[in-house]
Every structure is written in structure tokens, then in C-alpha cells.
Amino acid sequence: MARVKRGNVARKRRNKILRLARGFRGGNGTQFRTANQRVMKALCNAYRDRRRRKRDFRRLWIARINAAARINGVSYSRLMGGLKKADVRINRKMLAQLAVADPASFTTVVTAAKS
């Protein structure tokens, strides 16, 4: 079997990893072996956190809606149940935005949910 020297291919593969590791501290950004480990870890974290971000924002919206709803004298669960019964189709992201940016209109939404 013929011997294969992997000069160009190996260099390109290593440089690709080192390019991804640019900005990492110390040997993590300059030495291929540690850079490869750090890049794999970083990509795993990025994949996981893209999914976690959706959960985190939903929790944030719910906390904001709950705080604003309690100021208006109703709990989060009663507010959401009332909105469902009143057939008010507005999502949590928009409700949280209303609660922060325009409390007066949020109060009108709460009164619609109460009745």
C-alpha cells in the first residue's frame, strides 16, 4: 500500500480548528490539541444553550407577567385562564412586553380576563 503524506489536508484541518478557537485564552487558542478540546466543548455548549435560551426567555416572560398581574390584583394562573376563557389570543412574549412598556394597556387586558 502506498504511503500518504497528509501535508495540506492535515494543515487545513488544524487551521480550521484553530480559527474556531481564536480568542480563547492561553494554549486553548494556540495549541491544536487543547484548542480542539475547547472547540468541541464550546460547540456542545452552544448547541445546548440554543435550546435552553427558549426556556429561559419563557421563564422571564412568565415572571414579568406574574409580577404585573399581581399589581393588578390577580395571579398569573388566573390571568391566563381568564384570557383563555375570554378568547384573547395574545402570547406570553407580547404580554410581557405590554407589562413592561405599557402598563395601562396591560391593565385593560387584565380587566378583560377578569370579566
Curated annotation (Swiss-Prot):
Pfam families xref list: Ribosomal_L20
UniProt entry keywords in alphabetical sequence: Ribonucleoprotein, Ribosomal protein, RNA-binding, rRNA-binding
One annotated GO molecular function: rRNA binding
Organism superkingdom: Bacteria
GO biological process, one term: translation
rRNA-binding recorded as keyword: yes
PANTHER family: 39S RIBOSOMAL PROTEIN L20
HAMAP family listed in its UniProt record: Ribosomal_bL20
Family: Belongs to the bacterial ribosomal protein bL20 family.
Record-given protein name: Large ribosomal subunit protein bL20
Annotated source species: Synechococcus sp. (strain CC9902)
Name of encoding gene: rplT
